[in-house]
Amino acid sequence: MHRTGLIAAAGCLATLVFASAAEAQSMTTNEVKGTSISRKWRGTAGLVTTGPDGKVIFLFGETQPSVVCSPLQVCDIELQGGEIVRDVLVGDSVRWKVEPATSGATGGQAIHLIVKPSEPGLVTSMVVTTSRRTYHIQLKSHPSQYMARVGFEYPEDVSTKLADINSRLETGGIPGTAPDKLNFSYSVSGSAPWKPKRVYSDGAKTYVQFSKSISGQDAPVLFVVSGGQNRIVNYRMNNDMMIVDYAVDKAILVSGVGWRQQKITIRRGG
C-alpha cells in the first residue's frame, strides 16, 4: 500500500511538472505579439561602420548590437565619455566575465567593459544601465573571430552638433540654379511619416524636401554613407528643406531609437 501511494504521488508530481512546462511554453496573444516585436528589433540588420583604430561602431538604439568575442581574447566595449555606469547584468554570468576599465581625463572619462567568454559557442545577453541610457547587447563567443573594439554613435549627439553648426550658418534660400542643372534621379525607400517628398542635387549640394508640417526640431538625423561608413556632414534646415553641403550618393535618415526607430534610405540613381 505504501509503495502504491508513493507511485501515485510520483505520478501526480510528474503530471504537475509537465503541465507547468506546457503552460510556460504556451503564450497568450499579447505575449506572442510582444515577443514578435522584440524578435524583430533584435533581428534588424542595423548599421555597422568603422571607427578610429578599427573600432566597430553601432548606431545606438537601431537594433540589438551583437558583439562577437573569443576565448583567450578580450572585447573592449567603450561607452560614451562622461557616462556613469549604474549596473551591468549578464544572462550567463558564470561563463562570461565582464570587468570595467576607464580611459581619459577626470570629468570626461569613458567607461570600457572588458568582456571575456570562457569557451566558444556561447550566446547570452547583457544589459548595461547608465546615467544617460540603457544598452541591450547580445554576446556571442567564437573559436577564433572576435571584435577587439566596439563603440557607439548616438543620434542625439549628432543633432546637438548639427544645431551648433546650423546656428553659425546662414539659412539663406537655395542658390539660383538653372533647372536643367538639377539632378532629380534619387530613390527614397523606407516608411516614416516624415518621408521626404523629393531629393535633388545641383552637383555641389543635395536638397531633401519634406512636407510643410516638419520643423527643424522634428527633422531626422542624416548620415552620409561613404566607403562603407556612416559620416556626418554639414547640413541645415530651411523651413521644409534639408540642405546638405555635399553631393550625396547614399544617405540614411534616422529618427527615434529602439523599436520605435524609423529609417529612410536615399540613393542617387535609384
Swiss-Prot record:
Keywords: Conjugation, Periplasm, Plasmid, Signal
InterPro entries found in the cross-reference section: Conjugal_tfr_TrbG/VirB9/CagX, TrbG_Ti, VirB9/CagX/TrbG_C, VirB9/CagX/TrbG_C_sf
Main localization (coarse): periplasm
SS bond partners: none
Signal peptide: 1-24
GO CC terms of this entry: periplasmic space
Record family assignment: Belongs to the TrbG/VirB9 family.
Listed NCBIfam families: PRK13839.1, TrbG_Ti
UniProt-recorded name of the protein: Probable conjugal transfer protein TrbG
Gene name of the encoded protein: trbG
